[in-house]
Amino acid sequence: MTWRPTIAALTGLCLALTTAAGPAGAALPASRDAPHVNAHTFTGPPGAPPGVCPEGAAYGPPLPAGSVSATKIRSGFSFLEGPVWIADGGYLLMSDMAAGTGPNNVQPSTIRRFTPPATFDTFIADAGSNGLALSPDAQQIIAATHDQRNVSAYRLSDRARSTVAADHQGRAFNSPNDVTVRSDGVVYFTDPNFQRGNRPDQMSGRTSVFRVSGGQVSLVDDRLRQPNGIALSPDGSTLYVGAYSENKIYKYVVQPDGSTGARSVFVNYLGGPDGVTVDCAGNVYWASGSDGLIHVYSPAGAQLGTIRSGGAGTTNVAFGGPDRQTLYITSGRTNDSGLYSVRLNVPGYPY
């Protein structure tokens, strides 16, 4: 998952949206569902928030040592996933999936907010989300929403919900899991079946990666077994996807128009590859669901070190803080899920 704010000229996030306007700028009560609004096309303005990665900057090793440990901020959540840093407000959003199930045997999910150093509150109740990303203008979060088997956008100002991708050729997705957005608004997302519940399979047993461009959904790859974490390289020319049930990480060449070309293996073995982010040097940080570590790889796929969170079943990562050198880590042990952080040498991207 990765929006690249270092590219100054944006054509915006062009989405086919179905939303419901709430009062502009109004904070919604924690118990209120996000509103839905009428279909329209959203286009972000030119420009981007202050660049995370200065042009021409040189970076050394990303980790202070070959193996480092993160510090626990708080535990006791249900199951945290999908952290995304919101620079304008100075806070982190993340999905918290309940241990129980709702209708159709599907996990309910709430978006929590963490404002450093120690404040937590509910940002969107009943969000139905897993992985989160940012729109190019940073005014919306783009969410893989398993509750409606689609990809949604939530406006930060009033939490209004929109539909980014409803289906593929009239067939419902399994349960979208993770998402990334290119600086020109092209959206990529993974669709395993982890949270499909007892809803019917409309994908003929396939678990896939999809792309959304100009409101049109197209297939990237349906050969992967349970695709999970997804990210773009800093220049947007490489798409990384973790295949959870294959214990492999793949990479795809991304063309200027957002279409994908050749696929190759990036990392041949990582136990349960889950969420991922990248830093300004192009290093890749991948959460492993099997060993609870964050594995750090160079752009060439060489392992540079590991980060231990202390939590079991590490789920996802995102850079945050004023200088983007704080790596936030979510762990997903059911009913004892936690948020951790560690300071690193290289700044990175907010999801």
Predicted regions and their residues:
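A short loop-to-beta-strand structural motif that recurs across blades of beta-propeller domains
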Residues: 107-112, 150-152, 207-210, 248-250, ...
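Secretory targeting and sorting signals
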Residues: 2-27
